[in-house]
Amino acid sequence: MRSGGLEMMSSSAIVAFNLKEGKNWWWDVNESPVWQDRIFHVLAVLYGIVSVIAVIQLVRIQLRVPEYGWTTQKVFHFLNFMVNGVRALVFLFRRDAQNMQPEILQHILLDIPSLAFFTTYALLVLFWAEIYYQARAVSTDGLRPSFFTINAVVYVIQIALWLVLWWKPVHLMVIISKMFFAGVSLFAALGFLLYGGRLFLMLQRFPVESKGRRKKLQEVGYVTTICFTCFLIRCIMMCFDAFDDAADLDVLDHPILNFIYYLLVEILPSSLVLFILRKLPPKRGITQYHQIQ
């Protein structure tokens, strides 16, 4: 009995020691300027890779259908190229960005790619909504004006928050700004759930022998799940970021948290979606290929 008790105490001591060592490792990495730069540079490389993949796909689409102008598909890939390219530059010069003055410039530099990411994937929701309503013989005339209006409202509100934060740099305004973006992320997640879910259910009702039905069904299902999950995670994380200093993403001494967060909400989702949507459009006779007016 006594030896068993000693073994249990020894096991508990080992577990406690391992937890302490793990905590110390996390702290050491977060506080080390060398590790901070390494992690931010790894993020820059990953974003750069995604950006290059997006622009390569854009060029392939242009070479395949040069007779079309700026279609939804081309704009989607171009925005992916821009968003990931800007993120790569931000993380490459992350330490310099943190020292920018006035401080409002730091917020703008870190927030603009997030807003552009929202616009990029809202465009995908618009594309699916158009397909869904066209298949049901419902007018889609109001969809694009709604898309531009929603984006304009989001950008105007965010710019107003930046201006107020510049005029009165209090912590309350930072909280409001982050909670606003949490709301925007939740709105995007619900958009994917609504129109991705509707399109998925509609495709399920098509005859089994329909050409491409199975592949398109999988494509819509996968992309809906990925995008809904990433925007929901972003929403939840923004709520923690707003109220908990330990979850602050806009500082240099949380590199591991930054790596996990941006990997889950931007890098992996963008990579997976670009892979799933890698199929090139047919050269002629394409009815779902919409040109941006």
Curated annotation (Swiss-Prot):
One Pfam short name: THH1_TOM1-3_dom
GO CC annotation: plant-type vacuole membrane
Compartments in which it is found: Vacuole membrane
Extracellular membrane side: 1-38, 95-107, 168-173, 241-255
Membrane topology, from the record: Multi-pass membrane protein
Residues in the Cytoplasmic compartment per record: 60-74, 129-146, 195-219, 277-293
Knockout-associated phenotype: When associated with TOM1 disruption, reduced efficiency of intracellular multiplication of tobamoviruses (e.g. crucifer strain TMV-Cg), characterized by a reduced accumulation of viral coat protein (CP) and reduced amplification of TMV-related RNAs.
Keywords on record: Membrane, Transmembrane, Transmembrane helix, Vacuole
InterPro entries documented for this protein: THH1/TOM1/TOM3, THH1/TOM1/TOM3_dom
Transmembrane parts of this sequence: 39-59, 75-94, 108-128, 147-167, 174-194, 220-240, 256-276
Source organism superkingdom: Eukaryota
Assembly description: Constituent of tobamovirus replication complex.
Family to which the UniProt record says this protein belongs: Belongs to the plant tobamovirus multiplication TOM1 protein family.
Chain's role: Contributes to the intracellular multiplication of tobamoviruses, probably being a membrane anchor promoting the formation of the replication complex.
Record protein name field: Protein TOM THREE HOMOLOG 1
Organism: Arabidopsis thaliana (Mouse-ear cress)
Upper classification of the organism: Eukaryota, Viridiplantae, Streptophyta, Embryophyta, Tracheophyta
